[in-house]
Amino acid sequence: MLKDYFKLKENGTSVRIEALAGLTTFATMAYIIFVQPVVLGAAGMDAGAVFTSTCLITAFATVLMAFLANYPVAVAPAMGHNFFFAYVVVLTMKIPWQVALGAVFLSGIVFVATASFGLREMIVASVPDSLKSAIAVGIGLLITLIGMEWAGIVRLDPNTFVTLGNLSSKPVLIALLGLGTTIILIARRVNGAILIGILVGAVAGLFTGIVKNPGSVLSVPPSVLPTAFQLDVWTALKQNLIAVILIFFFLDLFDTVGSLIGIAKQAGLMKEGKLPRAGRALLADAIGTVGSALSGNTTMVSYIESAAGVAVGGRTGLAALVTAGMFVIAMFFSPIVQMISGGLAVQEVINVEGQQIARTFTLYPVTSPALIVVGSLMIRSVRDIDWNDFTEALPAFLTLIVMPLTFSITDGIAFGFISYALLKVVTGRGREAHWLIYLFAILFIARYAVPGLH
């Protein structure tokens, strides 16, 4: 039955190959179940509930992808979007996480509408490639900076903003070991390199006492109720969070389209330059985001790590089905996840204008290497920016540099859109920009100019 439904013979594959592909994809993306509880935990959400939610919603959305689109693609909470949710919307904008979940839900509804009514092509085409690439690079730089800080490799400094951390301390050495392991394995093209790096750091942490022994390996999954159905949609609408909702939507749309096209090209699924069943694939992602908000999680995207499964022969949704099954199984290993994603409180004394001030901060030596590596992989998009055209290069540069400097993805996108529209107009090339660019530039200017909107 599965052979016929997923058309294994027509796609030149088998149950064994699809199973191997599904396991490979899981190994390459399993780091999200360790990282997501830490990121959303920083926003005040229950880490155990986030862990269970991550496993459940990933399995749900990936099953949708398998049956709706028959693609070997896994869908999970997006790296980058989770940091926008926690560090920008909740911690910087001071919006309660329940309201932020409401914004995620609304962005998912917008995504469902565009996927259902065929508006995605116009929206994707409206944003120039240089800005799309710069957004990915900027998010990558921000994630890398946070990863470096979590590792203790760099630390905040009142005089220079950031400075080098204590590289001889145990937590930093554990982080460097995990980072070095991951980098070497990626260079050697080993599948699951990020996951292996996390596990190496965890084992080293156990031996050095940095990581606490969990006591057990298996347990009943933590309850999802502390975060499930806690979203506040009404307040998200009242608080004028249109910019936040649209940014969630755009990030989701761009990431998903980019990942699907990249994976489809590798798998040979493109036909005459087009992706068959693209609407169904986007709908699976969009429904996943709606479900994610309901379960207490962030926007969902098609994971580019699915390309690892494609590389070993995955061609159909059966591979995605296997990946989904692995995330369900992972729920029962919560003691291991809690051990790995736990933070370590560190105290230090810093000099501020001649005064000695003690401060406490939290390091995540086991999971931080994953952020640094994922961030570095996102920066590869910088090669797609046209650096020879100043009207393309400057907006792209402002986009990618403002994000890490302000810890704000929103401000980076705003600077990029405003400067892009301005430069195209003053150089007499206004027709090169889509009318949506000008609309968003005006909205972003109003956001800064009108009190209460920023």
What is the meaning of each model-derived region?
Residues 2-36, 57-58, 78-87, 91-136, ...:
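Helix-loop-helix junctions within the multi-pass membrane cores of secondary transporters/permeases
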